[in-house]
Amino acid sequence: MSQLDLLNIVHRPRRLRRTAALRNLVQENTLTVNDLVFPLFVMPGTNAVEEVSSMPGSFRFTIDRAVEECKELYDLGIQGIDLFGIPEQKTEDGSEAYNDNGILQQAIRAIKKAVPELCIMTDVALDPFTPFGHDGLVKDGIILNDETVEVLQKMAVSHAEAGADFVSPSDMMDGRIGAIREALDETDHSDVGILSYAAKYASSFYGPFRDALHSAPQFGDKSTYQMNPANTEEAMKEVELDIVEGADIVMVKPGLAYLDIVWRTKERFDVPVAIYHVSGEYAMVKAAAAKGWIDEDRVMMESLLCMKRAGADIIFTYYAKEAAKKLR
């Protein structure tokens, strides 16, 4: 009798993998189009679209073209966008960030008028709005915290006035969530939510995004306010503080390299958890696919599903359109 004849295997996991139908029936996690948010870059001008050179397939849009893009996104079933603006001018005081006729404020009004059902989230940070490329105001090479928070309050309120459904502070200044919540409530915008970039790491995966937004730091790096990639418990502290201060949704950023942080956040806190599939992660897939080294569609869908499996309720991704088409 051969060795194989002697096997007495009661539990054979492969039974449940034998056919596609069986695999689908026992699948534990499912990605849907409702999970996706599309980051949208808006620039000055009219009737123009520019491809971001370091992010093939990702574009900057003038407001009129952004409106058309949002109509297409909503038709695909995508429920939300996150708006990022490229201002016509940058100032040291960041005042363009809260200009009622600024790039983001105009975009919010136009998109909300054209696609009122779409959830509009807006980035709240100063890096595109000052010449320094940092998320806060700068004095003598130092990124100021409390002074920055005052500007962020004005920025968030201006977005709410324009029609934003959620503001998304990505700046990582201490105390900004509580301050923004207070400012929104005091200006009769208690229905406007806050999606906090709660655990945002000082990552090397952000390079192409800064290219897209023309917002690379002009000196130093962001390690004095963004988190050390080596730290886990610090992330839990940041998340807890933001929840206590009034965050409705918390985010972990970047994505794939920080799935352990997503899982810990979801296990520890009873709030919706978002994840950002960031520009560097997107660009790496694009580059490898262009070389023919990987199947882009399969890697895209696997990456997004893994984020869902780790505990993400919401996934910000530049692949939202492509994924939505696959999921239809």
From Swiss-Prot:
Keywords: Heme biosynthesis, Lyase, Magnesium, Metal-binding, Porphyrin biosynthesis. GO terms for biological process: protoporphyrinogen IX biosynthetic process. It is an enzyme of class 4 (lyase). Pathway: Porphyrin-containing compound metabolism; protoporphyrin-IX biosynthesis; coproporphyrinogen-III from 5-aminolevulinate: step 1/4. The keyword Magnesium applies. Mg(2+) binds at E238. 5-aminolevulinate 2 binds at S279, Y318. One of its GO terms (molecular function) is porphobilinogen synthase activity. Pfam families: ALAD. GO terms for cellular component: cytosol. It catalyses: 2 5-aminolevulinate = porphobilinogen + 2 H2O + H(+). Its EC number is 4.2.1.24. Catalyzes an early step in the biosynthesis of tetrapyrroles. Binds two molecules of 5-aminolevulinate per subunit, each at a distinct site, and catalyzes their condensation to form porphobilinogen. Belongs to the ALAD family. Homooctamer. PANTHER family: DELTA-AMINOLEVULINIC ACID DEHYDRATASE (PTHR11458:SF0). This is Delta-aminolevulinic acid dehydratase. It comes from Chlorobaculum parvum (strain DSM 263 / NCIMB 8327).
